[in-house]
Amino acid sequence: MSQTIKNAGRINQFREAVIRSLKGALPDVRDCGCQFGRFNLEELETQMLVAPAIRVAVLESRLNPVASGQMSADLHLGAFIITTGKERDVSSWLLAEAIAVLCHSGQLWGLTHLSAPREVQIEPIISAAIKQRGVSISVVEWHQDLHQLGHDIFCDEGQLKSGLISWDNEVGA
């Protein structure tokens, strides 16, 4: 991925920080990467994943304007867990619990301008046979607010700062 794409926005940086943290905390996971939207069975049939695998997705981002001209994003995130084999359900729950525990009240994923994770939940999605192998998919979902998206109009380089400051001799009578 080019440097331009990596620096394209805080939401992508946030997702990459979560992936880095999960890789560090769960070294037995063989494949950990990003996912666009929800993970489904059709994707599992077409993608070559080495289980156990985790795919991190931003499922929704609700943007709220802030007085500074910036935005704050209420992110709805999902870490999709893919496990295989006889013990796939047990493995799936173990990984889901580990990820959910990582979503503690002090978890900022190495970033700043971020709220604590909230509304953490685990949901089993499916356990089925695909291409003659048993596969389980579950998801850990949570919400987290990402602040200071965009430019602050009141910073030194801001466009409005000089327009908001007036001198006494500039005010007409």
Label the predicted regions:
Residues 48-61:
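A short, hydrophobic beta-strand-centered structural micro-motif
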Residues 43-46:
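Short N-terminal edge-element motif at the start of the domain
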Residues 1-36, 59-173:
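Charged, amphipathic alpha-helical segments and their flanking helix caps
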Residues 39:
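Extracellular glycan-recognition surfaces and repeat-rich motifs
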